[in-house]
Amino acid sequence: MTRVARYGKLVAQEGRGRELAELLLAAAARLEDEPGCELYLVNRQADAPDTVWVTELWRDQSALQAVLEQIKGSPETAAAMKLVAAAEMIELDHLGGKGPA
């Protein structure tokens, strides 16, 4: 199986970065028991407080797709998306490093 890594860059509406980050941190907590999610980190850009980065690592593409299907149309997803002014998702090939091997 090939792990799937992603960086998500989410720019919140002006002044709403903290609120967006809190919703994403709640999403991270809900993923604690999701075996296919190996890493879900939420970070705020130091020089741009309305920009939130999410770093994800998934067991494989099917694990990612299963979670995306679960959250599609959920109230939590809708609430977060209302705060997003711009978004970019960067797909990566996980090679290794410190953390999950």
Regions found by a protein language model. Name each.
Residues 21-22, 71:
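Short alpha-helix boundary/capping motifs
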Residues 4-10, 41-68:
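Short, well-ordered beta-strand segments in beta-rich or mixed alpha/beta enzyme
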Residues 2-4, 41-50, 76-101:
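Glycine-rich beta-strand-turn "strand-cap" elements at beta-sheet edges
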Residues 11-20:
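Short, surface-exposed ligand-recognition loops at beta-strand->loop->(often short) alpha-helix junctions
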Residues 31-39, 57-91:
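An amphipathic, aromatic/His-enriched active-site/gating alpha helix that lines ligand/cofactor pockets
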